[in-house]
Each structure stands twice: as structure tokens, then as C-alpha cells.
Amino acid sequence: TSSRRNNEKDANKENILDSEETKKVPKTVLVVEDIQSNFFLVSSILKNKCQLLHAPNGLEAVEIVRTQSVDLVLMDMKMPVMDGRTATSEIRKFNAEIPIIALTAHAFDADRVAALKAGCDDYLVKPINGAKLMQTLKEYGC
């Protein structure tokens, strides 16, 4: 009987751990992208995996992160109104925890370093590789 109780306790612990992990899993991803076709491509890759929000520029992204519940940001670096590096720096002033992943056509090391220095947690290069995008999001809990 004590063995059965221990198994039940272990099962309860696993259920508690599962529910705690579920709470941490990013579910809402903000895609900051000014080119509609790129947003549609990301949307099709992430379809049914995350709830998506969209901002066409960095200024709107900062406002969305400030006012809505967002778990992860995919940030284009070159956009009108406010670029991705500036938006990332602004977000970091009030939210140091949210994962921000640069998603950009700029593939040079200097661009990568600049994005990471601005506060991005990771860096993905366009054209978008669906498998790489999914693997990266999985690493951040989505």
C-alpha cells in the first residue's frame, strides 16, 4: 500500500510540474514585420502552435509589449517608423525577461552582434527556415 501511495504522490508531483511548466510556455508570439508576405510566411509556419500578434513596425511593437500579454517577440531589424534594434532597446527598458529573437535578412556578423547588443536573445536569418524557426521557438518554450 505504501508503494501505491508513493506512486500516487509521484504522479501528483508530475501533474503539478506539468501544470507549472505549462504556465511558463510562451503561447503568444508577437511578430514584428513590415513586409506582409514575410508575416504570412511566419504565420503559416506557426499556425496552430502559438497565438500570433502582428506589429508592422517597432513603435507599435513597443506599445503592444507594454500593454498586452506577450510571451515572445520575433523582431525584424529593418522597418519604417522604428527599426528593430531601437524597438528592442526600448522594450528592454521595461521588460528584461521577454525573449526577443531577431528575424532579419542582414546576415553579417556585425548585424548579429548589433542585434544581440540591443537586447535580442537570439538571431535568425531570412529567408525563413521553418524547421530552424520552430527549433528556436521550442528552445524558448513555444
Per-range role (PLM):
Residues 40-44:
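Charged docking surfaces used in two-component/phosphorelay signaling
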Residues 50-56, 64, 124:
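Short hydrophobic/Thr-rich beta-strand motif most characteristic of the beta2 strand and flanking loop
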Residues 79:
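Receiver (REC) domain active-site loop signature in two-component systems and cognate sites
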Residues 68-74:
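Active-site beta3 strand of CheY-like receiver
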Residues 1-19, 140:
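C-terminal catalytic ATP-binding subdomain
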Residues 128-137:
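C-terminal output helix
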